Amino acid sequence: MTRSLLAVGLALCVGVLLVSSSPTTAQPAAPPKAANADGELVGKVKDSIDKGVKYLKDTAAKNNGHWEGVVLKSLVDMDGGTTALAVLALLNSGEKVDSPTVKGGLDYLRKLTPAKTYVVALQTMALSEALILSRDKKDLPKIAKNVEWFEKNVIRRGGKLEGWSYPGNAIADNSNTQYALLGLYAAKTAGVKIEDKLWKDIQDYYTRTQKQDKLNPKAGYWLYHNAGGEGPSYTMSVGGACGLLIANMGLDMSEQDLNAATGVAAKCGIYPDNIALAKGMFYIGANFNFEQGKSYFYNYYGIERLGRLSGQRFIGKMDWYREGCEKLVKLQQPDGSFAYSSDAPGIDKGYPTITSSFALLYLSKGRTPVLVSKFAWGNYLKGEVGKQDQAILTERNPDGTITDAPNWNRKHSDCRNIVEFAQREIFDGAPLSWQVYDMRLQDLSTQAKIDSEVGLLLQSPLVYMNGHGSMPFVTRPTDTALSVPEQILKRYVEEGGFLLAEACCGNKDFAASFEELLARIFPGSALKKVPPEHAIWTMFPGIGPGDFPDLMYLDRGCRTVAIFSPRPLAGYWEERRFFPVDGRDPKNHGEKAFCLARNIIAYATGMELPKPKLTKTILVPPEKGGIARSKFRALQLKYISDASVQQPPASDALRNLMAYLGQHAKLDVALTSEVLPPSAVQLTKYKFMYLHGRKPITFTVEESDNIKANLQTGGLLLADAACNDIKQWKVFDQSFRDAMLKMFPDQKLVVIPTRTPDGKEEPLYKIASQAGINLGSVECRRENAEGTGAEKKLRTYPVMLEGIKIDGRWVVIYSRYDIGCAIEGHKSADCLGHDKESALRIASAIVLYSLRR
């Protein structure tokens, strides 16, 4: 067998000898994309994945259910490598484990006992992915056997780990080593026990073999062969940084020296790989380029792994997933495969199953919804302009010294671990990710850019903040203007986001800083202790208020928008030894800390999956200038006379509703609504009134008569019960019915039917249908069977609206299930109400009815 054939065969089995020459300088980041471009790219990526999946399925159907070819299967003894890669790509693209194509590929793999590192690794990864998705552990013995193979075939010299190679070859290489590590971690996630010593040896290996960049003291890289004299390898540097991240993730116990009783770490923020990882990330960011090495597609997959494992949205200054998607979709062929452009080199050129699988892994895994964003903050240095590191941020301490342990990131795996636990406990194993959110090098000089940034952050339903010391962006109480980070966090919460914060190691300076932040962005609001009746204690069993007596919360309008723990939690989240085997029966305080995170996430998300990455929320800008007399303008009734209430609940609901009507129904609307008490003499100017209720209604006779007069002269009142605990929800519901009975003694609220008594379509539904609004069914969370709370998940129901009719016209329309909080974007698993899309449809139909009638 010729050396060239061997090289091609091995490279095609995921990357042997994919070594780059000297890296090219990173290109400047592209200008921000327009809002419509974001939506277009989301659609393009989805279509591209669908076409790629079809291509792989069609290829397997023509090849007896697998993807092997003569070269890899017979000539280089790598049977199963291509099939495992294709199965992995299909599973990550949404194919079910029991689909005929995936089942056929898995059956093929189960018959094999591979003896090459790449194939053993890929077989392990494919079988582990299938096990996690199906929860069927039949392949666990085979996965465990593969772990034994890795442990047996690792190369050591003088007691030190040197990596993996091909059986019989005593010289290890970083490509084989990288895939051995991927296989080992996949096995661990599937449930195979791997001793911490092996992970520490791997950490030591990557730290020891990193080379110092002679051009930049802040950067370090890796080679393909540590014994060789070749230059830096970009692809192996990406693999080296991934190796450090994975080895740290594999450890059951970190080296932070955690006190399990208190949650305080004696060595908080100290990691043996801190410096090596920082140097590796610096090198990769400064030299970022997708078109590196002998296989660009292999490089795409490496970059995807690094971006996802590190949680970084930006590598250097490159928005890696967005930029990679834009490039990859252009490389897709009419048959759904992915191929190089005609003039591009590539050792895997002409092998579309390999290139297509790598492309799908990039597109699909990178698209994984972001559940939690970890908020980066603190002092920093920018790279020198004109130098290779101009796109890189260097962390520093408050005293100005450079640090590899920034105050916001003293725990490296806390966010990753709570997301993985929530994925298992709440979302039935659906793929989820986390990311670091770092705005510090972004150009946020205009309101439009700030709004765009908030729109991106909203793809993640939770923002997680923790650390040591005060956050420098929190301005003084005497400052009238909010800092840019304060503006972003305020708008994020107003648009439906949720804040989870924790004082790392119980740090009092951070606790005081976070409380000051909330006081700045929501004046008049204050953190309070979470009461025993709060829904987070009952989302899942296993914890109670006695376990976390100091836990704090902040309510705003419809619901709780922030949870803060002044006592340590992140130290437990950092270590997988506290990962509960049974989330309903935690054994110690560390396991209870994981269960608390689960319950908070369940509450904050309403147990709804986040939208895929790249999904951007377009914010409604504030209206500038005066309101034209011709514009339709809505009114919100503020019926609570309590002077401490600054605004009615769901105060942004009408703004979002008007923006929706302006876009979808082409109405000429005013985005700014009026807020008036029921007694206001101006009430008759507004023929659409909205009442969103949390507290019981007690209209005075004057207020009741004033509302009634408006209704009798063409007005319409839409009312709904806001998100609330079920006892308060029932109190409001009854108070509204009583108020309507006093207002209209001869009538009472009745269910609005879809048909009139003479069999015609009810005008409300007819007008909705004519406008293209489907009111046939909605997604709603109603009372549970016991009547003690809300259903755990949203369900599909017929629309449930009640009303009062005068002279053939509905003048009051009432939903006992929330509409306003949903339109604001709030999700809460204890809320009896609709999802946002359903709420917008219902409210839009009622507005159109009020205009047409």
Predicted regions and their residues:
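An alpha-helical repeat/solenoid feature that recognizes helix-turn-helix modules
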Residues: 27-51, 66-101, 112-148, 152-200, ...
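Aromatic-Pro/Gly-enriched surface loop or interdomain linker
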Residues: 368-462, 466-470, 569, 577-688, ...
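Signal peptide processing junction and immediate N-terminal pro/mature segment
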Residues: 18-30
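Internal amphipathic alpha-helical repeat/solenoid segments
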Residues: 56-82, 98-115, 440-451, 669-677
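Bacterial N-terminal signal peptides
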Residues: 7-20
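An acidic, glycine-rich "communication" segment
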Residues: 506-599, 603, 613-616, 628-633, ...
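Structural recognition of the beta-strand scaffold that forms the well-ordered cores
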Residues: 88, 123-125, 150-151, 177, ...
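Helical hinge/lid and interdomain linker segments adjacent to catalytic or ligand-binding clefts
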Residues: 101, 424-521, 539, 565, ...
